Amino acid sequence: MSENRIRIATRKSPLAMWQAEFVKAELERIHPGIVVELLPMSTKGDVILDTPLAKVGGKGLFVKELEVAMLDDLADIAVHSMKDVPVDFPEGLGLEVICEREDPRDAFVSNLYKSISELPLGATVGTSSLRRQCQIRASRPDLIIKDLRGNVGTRLAKLDNGEYDAIILAAAGLIRLKLSERIASFISAEESLPANGQGAVGIECRINDERVKALLAPLEHLETRYRVLAERAMNTRLEGGCQVPIGAFAEIDGDEMTLRGLVGNPDGSEIIEGVITGPKTDATQLGVALAEELLSKGAKSILDAVYAKA
């Protein structure tokens, strides 16, 4: 492999391609003369669009093919949305860099209404996220929640075709695709706690590839890493996946981190919440500690019941 070349495995969706192009541009800016190639590929998650994620295997659906490409030395790195990255990595691969986070909030998108509170009784809302469904149902049990799969453009088209009165998307994706004008309102973290890692881009590579790791190092954003580490640690301890409504969101003020988390029933009938504060350098420990608090408050019974049905 040429010392001056790097190959990026990426999904083919417009948002995934934006993320890969972003990393490509950053590498070219930092390392003049470097040759960066994009290797777009389809993942199982991109192909299976008629079934809710919770029923077809969850987060790993969006990364496995990219990881195989790296293990087979067809690619050097893979670029991911952090909220799609599973807890565990295949042997020989690891998460080398987490880039600076975009807006982590959820976005309310509608052509008719400005916010969830404005929706009329019995309105139809589209989202495939059990985390979002749970929190919406808790505040608005009258709403009809329908699954919504596909890339951002497909989801917006379904809204525009009248299949939904509103849809909920990650704000970061709309911002990156220059579709901010479609956002009717941002949903605060207090109203809808984001998914762990939402809005952050991660770069995975072979853990023994020192050449690539050195090239990637300048893209690391330490504050984002602390936040995402805490959120993922909570999720890991809870053994969370796509089939359980789990929210986690860390904020940093100086050296102090505040991490909020929740576990809920998919129908929104019960939500268990917690918050913890401590040094940002203890990010992983804070995540585990908050998970333990949630479990002690009754999250375990919710998780056991959900997994029993899965």
From Swiss-Prot:
Q: Which UniProt keywords apply?
A: Porphyrin biosynthesis, Transferase
What Gene3D superfamilies does the record point to? Periplasmic binding protein-like II, Porphobilinogen deaminase, C-terminal domain
Cofactor(s) listed: dipyrromethane
Entry EC no(s): 2.5.1.61
Pfam families on file = Porphobil_deam, Porphobil_deamC
Record keywords: Transferase included?
yes
The remark listed among the other comments is:
The porphobilinogen subunits are added to the dipyrromethane group.
- Protein name according to UniProt: Porphobilinogen deaminase
Q: Which organism is it from?
A: Shewanella baltica (strain OS195)
Report the gene name: hemC
